[in-house]
Amino acid sequence: MASFHVIEHVDSPRSFVCAAAERLKPGGLLVIETPNIDSLPFKLLKSRWRQFIPEHYFFFNPETITQLLAQHGLKIDSIRTIGKYASVDLIMNRLGRYVSWLPNVNGFSQLTFRVNPLDIMLVFATKSS
């Protein structure tokens, strides 16, 4: 079962995880992707962090998501951070919000790079037997 950017939007993460755990068979896998409130981008940017939006009712870090899942019989297999591909144009646009002296990147704007700001967790958990 997979949940990508859902748990931070629900009224009750406990109920959400409970419902997921009830539907999993023993040994079944739950995958959750959610912002990581312990990330460096949050620590540096605080309320300007791109994931700090009103639609996110709850935030988690590796410890709190581990505790929540354990309360419902789920054991963490791994927690990873994920990245994405971003164009030079997007990167410069995002950085330009905080740094006004960035150079012009004409001709390079469509180049893409893999970036990982370490602020999104991908959690793999298994239901206990």
Descriptions of predicted regions:
Residues M1-L44, F59-L74, D119-K127:
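Conserved SAM-binding loop
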Residues G27-L30, S47-R50, L111:
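Homeobox/homeodomain signature
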Residues L45-I53, M92-V99:
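Short glycine/proline- and charge-enriched loop/turn segments
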Residues H56:
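Conserved glycine-rich, hydrophobic/aromatic-active-site segments
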Residues S78-S129:
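A C-terminal cap/extension of S-adenosyl-L-methionine-dependent methyltransferases
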